């Protein structure tokens, strides 16, 4: 499954220096304010140009409903959730489990998949489905919050691809997941 799928799965996410992607209540102001101070789009537009599908969980999808305009209007959006009603939003498809989602992506002819949200990223990592991760680290320690990483089923070796330093002390590193040969 991991080496024969017709699409690549990439992560592009902001984290605190201590590895959190949001405060415990989901607040992202600590991230967005520093991202704005860093200037630039932090490489997001270059990243997203090769993406045709965005996969996220309910915890990422629901806060995104406040954005106007909808940020993924030109992408297929798939939400992995056991609780979101399947007909909740005509802009997205809802999938109950990872297997069903992967079959859907293959049937749709997905090529570049942006995997977003902590729980979904961890599920994809555990399944060996992430190919590349771009982590944008902002210089703040939150102490507590929603972690990006947690149990991922063992070591996941990474190869460093690049690192960029932006304004306001924001550091972005990209890693490719190494597969056993």
Residue ranges of each PLM-predicted region?
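Enzymes that bind and transform nitrogen-containing heteroaromatic metabolites
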Residues: 1-181
């Amino acid at each position: 499954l991991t080496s024969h799928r017709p699409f690549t799965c990439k992560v592009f996410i902001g984290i605190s220096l201590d590895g959190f992607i949001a405060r415990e209540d989901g607040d992202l102001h600590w991230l967005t304010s520093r991202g704005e101070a860093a200037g630039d789009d932090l490489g997001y537009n270059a990243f997203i140009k090769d993406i045709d599908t965005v996969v996220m969980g309910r915890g990422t999808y629901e806060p995104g409903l406040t954005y106007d305009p909808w940020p993924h209007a030109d992408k297929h959006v798939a939400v992995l959730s056991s609780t979101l009603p399947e007909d909740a939003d005509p802009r997205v498809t809802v999938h109950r489990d990872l297997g069903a989602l992967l079959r859907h992506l293959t049937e749709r002819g997905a090529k570049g998949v942006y995997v977003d949200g902590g729980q979904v990223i961890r599920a994809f990592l555990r399944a060996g489905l992430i190919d590349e991760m771009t982590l944008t680290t902002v210089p703040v320690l939150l102490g507590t919050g929603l972690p990006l990483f947690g149990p991922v089923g063992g070591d996941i070796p990474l190869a460093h691809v690049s690192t960029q330093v932006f304004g306001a002390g924001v550091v972005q590193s990209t890693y490719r997941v190494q597969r056993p040969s």
